[in-house]
């Protein structure tokens, strides 16, 4: 058994006491206003939707009145910058992400992405635009009937309160005829854009054919913004203006704005199985955060890098030096880096495995760590209680197995508690989203990212082609 001092050393790695939590000179972002009538007109009712509707309303009011955007934003023009003069009678190509799951009977099992697209579409139709809606569904290889968008039409029509017309293709004479007959305030859903291989290849001729259907372009598909496809990047070369939809803008505001210029202290929670998959995120967040909490399978690489025994836990041997470098970088920057002090270990990787809680420094041979322990949860919670902004990406353990889900669930519940107290809580996509939904606290978080790979790449500081292609915004005072 390692000494108490050795165990304590795992808990907090920092330079000098208090340095991390006193960096408060950077500007914080503003208060979220109460839901307005104009926000409600955009079609929200649930808690999570009301938060989004407030955000949408702030985008509209920031341009039409004297209001300003609530957070520092990526400088891209938004659909909220447009009005009825810009939109009435105009054909607007809207790229949304309606890639929803369907069961064997083609029934939608989760309509979250459809509901997330409604504010932008509703804003456009209320301002007299003719909406030409484009999306992908699944990964079809050519025209594949089971990936047709037909099952989406009833739910879209219900949420919008109008009859959505569906085309049998996304380009060609028949589509052009439907576009020509589209009334102001009407919506035409094009068939799955990925039925054409030219979409993912971003072929200019295909992009030009898509663009020829419309007068201007709105990208509201954050989940595909990291891909340079014809409908996300190519069309912008032929359509002006090309602007961000409300959902895409909200993602940028939180994942770029709130993270780059947070209310402090700012904590980042990063989990997941491998250090290699989160290197970019960790390195980027070390430049911005005051507190960094690490969990998930990656922690065992950090433990081994410090000379600890990890039993048969997952370790990336080729990342031991990197782990040491990241620990040193955190210390040099005055970031409080917390590793779990205890872990839940198992004798096999299975939901029915035998398990027990041990200090992180005392994992026996033949056992593997599959979750953080209760002492770690307590330490993490105490650190999070000091924060004003928290971003979370990645589970604390194998939360698919109920026996090893407690750490992840504890983080989800803690963030829900903090959010209710006014702390900005950002769920950065992927498994963290599944975790807060499983626990039933998704509705109280400040922001839940709709992107998987796009969220990670944005947090890593990478350029997203679908965002870069959009028009620059007129400067707005923040």
Curated annotation (Swiss-Prot):
Tagged with keyword Mitochondrion: no
Similarity comment text for this entry: Belongs to the phosphoglycerate kinase family.
Positions contributing to Mg(2+) binding: 431
Main location class: plastid
Superkingdom of source: Eukaryota
Reaction catalysis annotation: (2R)-3-phosphoglycerate + ATP = (2R)-3-phospho-glyceroyl phosphate + ADP
Pathways involved: Carbohydrate biosynthesis; Calvin cycle
Entry protein name: Phosphoglycerate kinase 2, chloroplastic
E.C. number: 2.7.2.3
UniProt source species: Arabidopsis thaliana (Mouse-ear cress)
PANTHER family per UniProt: PHOSPHOGLYCERATE KINASE, PHOSPHOGLYCERATE KINASE 1, CHLOROPLASTIC-RELATED
């Amino acid at each position: 058994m390692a000494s108490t001092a050795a165990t304590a050393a795992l808990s907090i790695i920092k330079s000098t006491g208090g340095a991390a939590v006193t960096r408060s000179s950077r500007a914080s972002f503003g208060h979220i206003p109460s839901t307005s009538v104009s926000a409600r007109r955009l079609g929200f009712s649930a808690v999570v939707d009301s938060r989004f509707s407030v955000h949408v309303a702030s985008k509209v009011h920031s341009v039409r009145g004297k209001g300003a955007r609530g957070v520092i934003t990526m400088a891209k023009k938004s659909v909220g910058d447009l009005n009825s003069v810009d939109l009435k009678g105009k054909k607007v190509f809207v790229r949304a992400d309606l890639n929803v799951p369907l069961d064997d009977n083609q029934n939608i099992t989760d309509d979250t992405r459809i509901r997330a697209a409604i504010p932008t579409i509703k804003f456009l139709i209320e301002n007299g635009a003719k909406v030409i809606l484009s999306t992908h569904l699944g990964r079809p290889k050519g025209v594949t009937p089971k990936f047709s968008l037909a099952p989406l039409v009833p739910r879209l029509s219900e949420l919008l309160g109008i009859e959505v017309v569906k085309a049998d293709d996304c380009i060609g004479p028949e589509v052009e005829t439907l576009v020509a007959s589209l009334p102001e305030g009407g919506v035409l859903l094009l068939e799955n854009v990925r039925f054409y291989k030219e979409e993912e290849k971003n072929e200019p001729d295909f992009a030009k054919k898509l663009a020829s259907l419309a007068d201007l372009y709105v990208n509201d598909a954050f989940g595909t913004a990291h891909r340079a496809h014809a409908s996300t990047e190519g069309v912008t070369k032929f359509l002006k203006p090309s602007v961000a939809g409300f959902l895409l803008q909200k993602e940028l505001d939180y994942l770029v704005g709130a993270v780059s210029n947070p209310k402090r202290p700012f904590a980042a929670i990063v989990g997941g199985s491998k250090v290699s998959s989160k290197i970019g995120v960790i390195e980027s967040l070390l430049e911005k955060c005051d507190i960094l909490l690490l969990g998930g399978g990656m922690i065992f690489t950090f433990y081994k890098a410090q000379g600890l025994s990890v039993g048969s836990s997952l370790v990336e041997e080729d990342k031991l030096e990197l782990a040491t470098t990241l620990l040193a970088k955190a210390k040099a920057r005055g970031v409080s880096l917390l590793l779990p002090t205890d872990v839940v270990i198992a004798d096999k990787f299975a939901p029915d495995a035998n398990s027990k809680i041990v200090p992180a420094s005392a994992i026996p041979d033949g056992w593997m760590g599959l979750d953080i322990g209760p002492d770690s949860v307590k330490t993490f919670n105490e650190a999070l209680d000091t924060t004003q902004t928290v971003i979370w990406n990645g589970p604390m353990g194998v939360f698919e197995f109920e026996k090893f889900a407690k750490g992840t669930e504890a983080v989800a519940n803690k963030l829900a508690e903090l959010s209710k107290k006014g702390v900005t809580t950002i769920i950065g996509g992927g498994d963290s989203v599944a975790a807060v939904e499983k626990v039933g606290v998704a509705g109280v978080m400040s922001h839940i990212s709709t992107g998987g790979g796009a969220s990670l790449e944005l947090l890593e500081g990478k350029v997203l082609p679908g965002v870069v292609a959009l028009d620059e915004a007129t400067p707005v005072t923040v």
